[in-house]
Amino acid sequence: MRSVVVGFTGFCTLVLLTIGLNTTSVQAREDASKPEFYTARVKPIFDTNCARCHGGINHRGGLNIDTRESLLKGGHTGPAIVPGDPSKSLLLTLIRHEGPANDPKNMPPNKSKLSDADIQTVTDWIKAGAIIPAASK
């Protein structure tokens, strides 16, 4: 009888953990689709790693990261992001350092690539539609 109780308890624990993990990943996807996700999670990454060269009055390579429209327009090499499709977003290719080994465009230049967590945050944001609040700059 005791082994049945222990087995049932273990099974229930496994089910609850699985439900909890699935809820967490769904919640993360939902959060990425909200304008607040950009303000709280994405903008700080851009401000720290990108804005010096691609924000404000600086638009190296023709890229301005300050608005969704400017990211959609992109720079001299085309659109920086394709909302809903991270695999077609040049911005992700560059911050992942996935270009050719001698590609000078890996971003940020002359620095290590962004952390996996930061790259995942930007990926989730693009996948969710790359929403930027209208008042954000």
Label every PLM stretch briefly.
Residues 6-9, 35-36:
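Short non-domain terminal segments
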Residues 1-5:
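Positively charged n-region of N-terminal signal peptides that target proteins for export
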Residues 8-22:
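Bacterial N-terminal signal peptides
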Residues 20-137:
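Aromatic- and Gly/Pro-enriched helix-to-coil junctions and flexible linker segments
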